[in-house]
């Protein structure tokens, strides 16, 4: 009998609520907000990015089918944090505040993301 391993969790540079820009793929250049992070697969769901359509069958008699749209996840390596003040995407670095808290900072602008 083998022990069941817990799934690998990846360290991600983005968090829920961050503003990001897509840097590769079909939606390259789009800016949106992270709705959900999936650390086990290192993926993020971004508002208005990678929108898919799904045809839903009617569930009950007399009900009509629907076409639903939803945001599918994209890999976190395809997104970069975005500064809304400077209108530029940037990598991040980790720094410490005067109080000793570890915060994320945009490398290009020096803007602190975690407040």
From Swiss-Prot:
User: Which Pfam families does the record match to this protein?
Assistant: KOW, ribosomal_L24
Record's keyword terms, sorted: Ribonucleoprotein, Ribosomal protein, RNA-binding, rRNA-binding
Biological process per Gene Ontology, one example term: translation
List, alphabetically, the SMART domains matched: KOW
Which Gene Ontology terms of cellular component type are present? ribonucleoprotein complex; ribosome
Which CDD domains does the UniProt entry name for this protein? Answer: KOW_RPL26
Sorted alphabetically, which PROSITE patterns does this protein's record hold?
A: RIBOSOMAL_L24
- Single GO molecular function: rRNA binding
What PANTHER family does the database record attribute to this sequence?
MITOCHONDRIAL RIBOSOMAL PROTEIN L24
Q: How does it assemble?
A: Part of the 50S ribosomal subunit.
Q: Per its database record, what is this protein's job?
A: One of two assembly initiator proteins, it binds directly to the 5'-end of the 23S rRNA, where it nucleates assembly of the 50S subunit.
What family, per the record?
Answer: Belongs to the universal ribosomal protein uL24 family.
- Entry protein name: Large ribosomal subunit protein uL24
Q: Which organism is it from?
A: Crocosphaera subtropica (strain ATCC 51142 / BH68) (Cyanothece sp. (strain ATCC 51142))
